[in-house]
Amino acid sequence: MNEKSFTVKNPSHEQNKRVFIDGSERNVAELPSMYIGKGVYRPGWRWSKHAGLQTGKESTRHIGYIVSGSTVIQDASGQETTVGLGDAFEIGPNHDGWVVGDEPCVALDFETR
């Protein structure tokens, strides 16, 4: 038996895409052990306004990495921090986030299966 020992996918080319009401989008690559999402969020995009409202869901825990741009994340207690280029982050459920500045925020997020 000769099973391949690797899986290669590019989230930018995957069919699992969500386009938000402002035109921002998130694609997901499904790997055997995890999901990797790539989001391109336009200036002014906000989770509660453009994702939560559209999906009817609460925000969940996110582990991610900012490829470009920046976003403010606000935790459930109201504390805020800005994450930007090169920052890795983890935030718990029931948070909000919004893009700051004139540049789209490109972020990767990781979720185990």
Q: Residues of each region from the PLM?
A:
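A short, N-terminal "cap"/entry segment at the start of jelly-roll beta-barrel domains
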Residues: 1-40, 48
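Surface-exposed loop/turn positions
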Residues: 32, 45, 87, 93-95, ...
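Conserved short histidine dyad/triad with adjacent acidic residue
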Residues: 38-58, 80
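Conserved GNAT-family N-acetyltransferase fold
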Residues: 39-41, 64, 89
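Short beta-strand segments in beta-sandwich/barrel cores
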Residues: 46, 69-74, 97
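Short, conserved beta-strand element in jelly-roll/cupin
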Residues: 55-73
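Short acidic-glycine-tyrosine-enriched beta hairpin
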Residues: 75-94
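Ligand-binding loop in jelly-roll beta-barrel domains
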Residues: 92-113
